[in-house]
Amino acid sequence: ADQSSVKLYTLNKHLQSVLPILRSILNESIFPEQELAIFVQNQKQSLQVNLQKNDFLARRQFANSIFGDTPYGSNIDAEDYDELKREDLINYFKAAFKPENCTVIAAGKFEENEFAILNSVFGNQWENTESSVINKFTFEASPAGELLIERPEAIQSAIRMGALSISRNHHDFPGFQVLNCLLGGYFGSRLMANIREDKGYTYGIGSAVVSLRDAGYFFIATEVGAEVCNNALVEIEKEINLLKTELIADQELDLVRNYMLGSMLGSLENAFSHADKFKNVYFSGLDHNYYENYITTVKTITSQELKDL
């Protein structure tokens, strides 16, 4: 994730009592040695378990392949946790968790009194003169290729394939989301119909487009029987090539339109989900016109435009 976030759910009548606690967490955390030791031990144990999972190995190798040794792609080893020191956390905390780096997004029944409470807690007496942490990364497209992690004892193979792509700031991003949905973005997608329903190679396969602050990427992920891994790769490539060379039937495109518009409506069911939608565009430097453009694109994009993408 590009941001660290703390979410608080509370009744209006308790706002005055709980906001100072939240402010204390953001301003006065001390990272006790005992708690840090427990955290390190738990993370090392979790990592040890995950390193036995094919999908975890594929996911972290994929991230490292496209993002390199940036925080987006660095592989963490057990030894890295051993080197984690309390003073490192405190120094980073002081530089990163400060007023100019903080954004408050409030959702719910907020009226004049609630805003006054919010401002009284976070609007003053929060000073930090430490130099700010500003992380910004650039990436270069990795050369195409295949990476194989050998696990002879495994009865399943994890597949993760993709590449650097566009982010939410690009004008083609909504159209790319439609294309992704067709390929592997929902249960009725082409990848599911072929790899799961027709061939029976997997219980599930999907694709996604992910927008980060400094980059975007596209990926396809699944787990298949080890003996059909190569066959699955052939079928995945076939489905991608069909989208490049053939126009999508109107009936299939209409089904995807309805699914995406319904999902959009379902994701706006309450004030908290509205806040999440706002956060997506706010941290991308966009405004609410993004969602209007998204809906228009889903409704009007043509098969030819998708083929061109």
Predicted regions and their residues:
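Charge-rich, well-structured scaffold segments of protease-associated domains
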Residues: A1-S131, S167, E197-L309
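Phosphate-proximal small/polar/acidic motifs at interfaces that engage nucleotide phosphates
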Residues: M192-A193
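His/Glu-based metal-binding/catalytic segments typifying zinc-dependent metallopeptidases
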Residues: N101, E130-S189
